[in-house]
């Protein structure tokens, strides 16, 4: 009886092993974070920001549990985006090896820097409002620093 053949890993054109499942999970988690923030901003935020006054009726929302979380929804949404980027920094994904690490690292750093600079220039203006930035106020700094922290996870994979 002969030995069973060894399982050949999936190789991409570059010669590296690529995990399609890990890539798909990273994309799904990032999209889930974006969807979470979008749903909260467009559907549940009115009920979350409602202050009771005589004669006013609380706005209806299909997600009352989401309205109860208030600004924690932003932490969940951005946390999912950061987690998806961290998953994408694994060496079995294209962003986790070779030039992809540099792209992911510099991209995350520059997105974080641009987010903070945009907040400082536009976020405190009374005439111009960016939908998520005008709700987070000083917490925008944590979002920018979060993107930079994700850049460090890419930097740890750099060879």
What label would you give each PLM region?
Residues 37-54, 117-125:
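Membrane-helix interface motif
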Residues 128-140:
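Non-cytosolic membrane-interface motifs at loop->transmembrane helix junctions
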Residues 77-84, 143-154:
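Hydrophobic cores of alpha-helical transmembrane segments in multi-pass inner/ER membrane proteins
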Residues 1-28, 43-65:
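Terminal, Lys/Arg-rich, intrinsically disordered segments and adjacent short helical elements
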Residues 70-79, 137-143:
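Structural signature of hydrophobic alpha-helical transmembrane segments
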Residues 92-99:
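Membrane-interface helix-boundary motifs at transmembrane edges
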């Amino acid at each position: 009886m002969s030995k069973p053949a060894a399982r050949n890993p999936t190789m991409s054109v570059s010669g590296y092993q690529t995990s399609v499942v890990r890539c798909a999970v990273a994309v799904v988690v990032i999209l889930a974070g974006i969807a979470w923030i979008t749903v909260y901003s467009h559907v549940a935020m009115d009920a979350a920001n409602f202050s009771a006054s005589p004669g006013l009726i609380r706005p209806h929302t299909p997600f009352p549990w989401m309205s109860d979380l208030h600004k924690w929804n932003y932490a969940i949404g951005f946390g999912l985006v950061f987690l998806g980027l961290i998953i994408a920094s694994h060496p079995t994904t294209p962003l986790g090896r070779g030039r992809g690490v540099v792209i992911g690292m510099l991209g995350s750093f520059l997105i974080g820097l641009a987010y903070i600079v945009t907040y400082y220039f536009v976020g405190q203006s009374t005439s111009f409002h960016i939908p998520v930035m005008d709700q987070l106020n000083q917490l925008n700094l944590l979002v920018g620093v979060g993107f930079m922290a994700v850049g460090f996870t890419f930097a740890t994979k750099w060879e």
